[in-house]
A protein has these predicted regions:
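C-terminal motif of bacterial Sec signal peptides marking the signal peptidase cleavage site
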Residues: 23-26
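Long beta-strand-rich cores associated with HINT superfamily self-processing modules
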Residues: 90-237
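Bacterial signal peptide processing site
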Residues: 28-30
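Repetitive helical segments and hydrophobic/amphipathic motifs
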Residues: 16-19
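Intrinsically disordered, low-complexity polar/charged tails and linkers
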Residues: 33-92
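Bacterial N-terminal signal peptides that target proteins for export
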Residues: 3-13
Length: 237
């Protein structure tokens, strides 16, 4: 309890320092500067955004764990986007650090039949706490589907995904998904699906990286669709 209290104090001390010592922008970005900025200004804003992610990550994880517990589910460890990944994303999307919504992120995992209940619970809990930002059901022509929430804190959004156990297995290699799922559940999914974990993301990365060969993209797209057929179908008709 003492360690938990100390961690909470440290988080809010960081928040106080940021509020007092740094000039930052709102989550809505209405007051953000537009146009060109210097590298120094961008790096300063990047520092701020990454620091706020450290503040808002723990309450995001707490909400996810509370919801998971109510539905006999699990959560992944809280994950923070790295500085390098954040900078690359800003360049690729022509965006600013505070516009990114996944600098702190986690995932609620549950049985396929519980997904709708978990989604309703995350929505209700986040709304009750005044931090509901948005919800999206995501699909793709590669067979992938999933559900994503963004929690809206004062200065930054964070992310909670909702996945079935089997679709989490499909998206992550063994060294990531086995510790989260546990040996027993991992082995059940491995036996029932008859395929190795993590190929969904593996195929996606190949498709995304190859921008020249339509034939290559189509080949891996078909592999991805076939791979997803071994797991839970999209619950949205």
């Amino acid at each position: 309890m003492k360690m938990k209290a100390m961690k909470t104090i440290q988080i809010w001390m960081l928040a106080a320092i940021l509020v007092c010592g740094i000039s930052f922008t709102s989550c809505d970005r209405a007051d953000n500067p537009t146009g060109e900025s210097t590298v120094t200004e961008f790096q300063h804003e990047l520092d701020q955004a990454l620091s706020w992610a450290q503040v808002y990550g723990p309450p995001t994880q707490t909400l996810a764990e509370e919801v998971a517990a109510r539905h006999k589910g699990k959560t992944t460890p809280l994950n923070y986007k790295t500085r390098e990944s954040t900078e690359r994303k800003c360049i690729t999307d022509n965006s600013r650090p505070f516009e990114l919504k996944d600098l702190a992120r986690t995932t609620v995992l549950c049985e396929y039949d519980s997904i709708r209940k978990v989604i309703d619970d995350v929505t209700a809990t986040a709304t009750e706490r005044g931090i509901f930002g948005r919800y999206r059901h995501q699909t793709s022509d590669r067979g992938y589907w999933g559900d994503l929430f963004n929690l809206k804190f004062q200065y930054l959004y964070t992310e909670i995904q909702v996945k079935s156990y089997r679709n989490y297995y499909a998206a992550n290699p063994e060294d990531i998904c086995r510790p989260v799922l546990g040996d027993s559940l991992y082995n059940v999914i491995h036996t029932e699906s008859g395929v190795e974990p993590g190929l969904s993301h593996f195929y996606y990365e190949i498709i995304r990286a190859d921008t020249t060969s339509e034939a290559t993209r189509e080949y891996y797209k078909k592999l991805c669709i076939e791979y997803h057929s071994h797991f839970d179908p999209d619950y949205v008709d």
